[in-house]
A protein has these predicted regions:
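N- or domain-start disorder-to-order transition segments that initiate the globular core
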Residues: 1-51
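M16/MPP (pitrilysin/insulinase) zinc-metallopeptidase core fold and M16-derived inactive scaffolds
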Residues: 30, 48-117
């Protein structure tokens, strides 16, 4: 059974982030914490409970400026390696060498997600 974090103070707060909101959610028996990265403004949502299954998801706003599909092309490009990360297909390397139960990438009309469980 995983240890549940009940409050932000239990996390050894990182000075690069500020606490925006914190609440215990009775209906799902989870603690919810929202942080903001001070320099970039990126928000981090942390849900903690005693479930042994874990999830991480990087999500980005990718509002379209036209109908060329650039956000979807970028989604696939991110998963094809680069000069500094020369794996031809790092996504498939993660699938083969991981204990994950879910690994994917998806583009919606206004956002792109990279979930891992």
């Amino acid at each position: 059974m995983a240890k549940q974090v009940r409050s932000y103070s239990e996390l050894s707060p990182n000075p690069s982030y500020e606490l925006m909101y914190e609440e215990y959610l009775d209906d799902i028996r989870s603690s919810g914490i929202i942080l903001r990265h001070k320099k970039s403004g990126a928000r981090v949502a942390v849900m903690s409970n005693d479930d042994s299954n874990k999830l991480f998801c990087a999500a980005f706003r990718t509002p379209p400026t036209n109908s060329t599909g650039v956000p979807h092309i970028i989604e696939h490009s991110v998963l094809n390696g680069s000069k500094h990360f020369p794996s031809r297909d790092p996504f498939m390397q993660l699938v083969k060498g991981s204990l994950n139960t879910f690994l994917n990438a998806m583009t919606y009309g206004d956002k792109t997600l990279y979930p891992v469980a």
